[in-house]
């Protein structure tokens, strides 16, 4: 059984026992989290939401928080001596999917 959930403005296909990386969640490591925005549940009988499947949820456990690799943002305007260099590291949360209800 699998499901498609929406979190952090992104849609992610998940299965039970899978480890996923999502935008930073406001939960401590070891805490249970529930994703209620379930768009699709697949298995023997598929359920498609309009836009969400009623009564469906996906639960998981927060394993850790972290930050992705640094990306460099560089702006430059030719012939004007304008240069700006800035780094960015996006925070993430690693979640282990436990149960798909739906």
UniProtKB/Swiss-Prot annotation:
Biological process (GO), any one: translation
Alphabetized UniProt keyword annotations: Ribonucleoprotein, Ribosomal protein, RNA-binding, rRNA-binding
Keyword rRNA-binding: yes
Domain of life: Bacteria
MF annotations from Gene Ontology: rRNA binding; structural constituent of ribosome
InterPro entries, per database record: bL21-like, bL21-like_sf, Ribosomal_bL21, Ribosomal_bL21_CS
One GO cellular component term noted in the UniProt record for this chain: ribonucleoprotein complex
Coiled-coil ranges (or none): none
Function: This protein binds to 23S rRNA in the presence of protein L20.
Similarity comment: family membership: Belongs to the bacterial ribosomal protein bL21 family.
Subunit relationships: Part of the 50S ribosomal subunit. Contacts protein L20.
Protein name, as recorded: Large ribosomal subunit protein bL21
